[in-house]
Amino acid sequence: MPLAPLKPLRRWIWRAFLQSALIPLVLVESVLIGVYLYTNESIRESQVGYLQSSALQDLDSAVRREGKVIDSRLRAIEAQVGVYRDAVAEALADRRFEPDELERQRHASTPGGVFHSRSDDGRAASFYAASTPAERQDRDKALRLSRVDPLMRSIKQADPLVAAVYFNSWDSYNRIYPYFDVLQQYPHDMDIPQYNFYYLADATHNPKRGTVWTEVYLDPAGLGWMMSAIAPVYRGDFLEGVVGLDVTVGQMLAETGNLQVPWQGYALLVGPDNAIMAAPEPNSGI
């Protein structure tokens, strides 16, 4: 019977080592690596979740704080509207007031029936639309309202959020500060009561006669996208007109744009009905 070939001692030792040590070691290391990777991923997800939760809490606090700041600024504007409304009502009622010669000289009429201011002189712009025939225009009223020009100027200068201060009458007369060339900017047959910055303050839309905010609209005075705080001016139960303070969307975005939003977010200004009132342009970097 032939003898079985002898295996070299080294091969026998290697096989024994492979079976008893190396393979179990590789298996254990594989398991440990798997556990490490799983644990590391779990820890990473926990850390990301914690950071996200922390960021959202910080953002919530920042938004609430910023909201209170903006709310206080807007309430200040509402208070200014109330002061301006009272001044306009008094100016309309005081027929004893005599406008100076400069105020008379800075007004002119077009052949089409527009009564308008033609020079700045540090005063408000004035525009009586041709939608009211010239013979029915209360031009004394238009000149009498020059009495409130200093207040309009003070309101505009006191609050950087305010882009313009104005009064619109029931018969399509507009007085607005700062001055601009109304004849070039406004439609000559402009029917002012048809605009939202007028009718939203009327008895139908605002029966409580308080200060209300418009939705965002394109300003006919050329100041871009705008929202206005407006309030009615009554003589008894007759609506003489509407006063307003304009705030541009760009100015509101400048207020909200400083808010640091994580996760590549950005700030929006949302109205009470959840309508977006102001948002940054796409790719604006905000």
Show which residues each predicted segment covers.
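Extreme N-terminal signal-anchor transmembrane helix of membrane signaling/transducer proteins, especially
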Residues: 2-49, 53
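Juxtamembrane membrane-water interface segments immediately C-terminal to a transmembrane helix
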Residues: 38-85, 89
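Short regulatory alpha-helical segment in sensory/regulatory domains of signaling proteins that mediates
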Residues: 71, 85, 89, 152-160, ...
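Extracytoplasmic ligand-binding sensor domains of the Cache superfamily
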Residues: 79, 83-93, 109-117, 150-160, ...
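Alpha-helical transmembrane helix bundles of large polytopic membrane transport and channel proteins
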Residues: 90-144
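Extracytoplasmic/periplasmic ligand-binding sensor regions of membrane-associated signaling proteins
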Residues: 156-246, 254
